[in-house]
């Protein structure tokens, strides 16, 4: 299988802990023995801090976006270092470069690409471009809920939903002040338009990522730490 993984910076680069990078690298190395794997790293807290500083100095939003992209690529560079010889040595800066890099047989790692797009959106577009078998959004949330569980204690978690239902949930959450959607709206639209199979999962524990993508990914069976998004009945 070809898997595109959006690995949130908030879980990968938390406290810039080198041991975390090494743990994720070990898991990704194992997954790559069974699947072709391309990873997009997020910026996390470091990106938010740098962007906040830039805004405080009056920087425009495009400049802030480029700063965020730079931070995602720094996280990608650290993950490549953790992967050692199993990681593709260069960071693709566009979708064409990424499509060529996957032929290397190594774990390909990249960051953001275009201002105005989150790394979730980049991952979804890349998954569509490469006709990936699965898009995985690895985050700190254990799946998709009927509403933001941080704001609504009655929110219900889904084991599996359709892309169309995902769009409805995401747009409803995004409309509410203070609420945060588990999937970027652009990424959700990409998933819908190309009927892409996707998994949103809590990957704060790297071993969970290995268990799900290493063994259960082909079964599409319910997972306690995530939600499958599929157009299949």
From Swiss-Prot:
Pathway: Pyrimidine metabolism; CTP biosynthesis via de novo pathway; UDP from UMP (UMPK route): step 1/1. Transmembrane segments: none annotated. It comes from the Archaea. Disulfide bonds: none annotated. Its EC number is 2.7.4.22. Inhibited by UTP. InterPro entries: AceGlu_kinase-like_sf, Asp/Glu/Uridylate_kinase, Uridylate_kinase, Uridylate_kinase_arch/spir. The keyword Nucleotide-binding applies. GO terms for biological process: 'de novo' CTP biosynthetic process; UDP biosynthetic process. Keywords: ATP-binding, Cytoplasm, Kinase, Nucleotide-binding, Pyrimidine biosynthesis, Transferase. UMP binds at residues 43, 65, 113-119. It catalyses: UMP + ATP = UDP + ADP. GO terms for cellular component: cytoplasm. It is found in: Cytoplasm. Pfam families: AA_kinase (PF00696). ATP binds at residues 9-10, 44, 48, 139, 145, 148. One of its GO terms (molecular function) is UMP kinase activity. Gene3D superfamilies: Acetylglutamate kinase-like. Belongs to the UMP kinase family. Homohexamer. Catalyzes the reversible phosphorylation of UMP to UDP. This is Uridylate kinase. It comes from Methanosarcina acetivorans (strain ATCC 35395 / DSM 2834 / JCM 12185 / C2A).
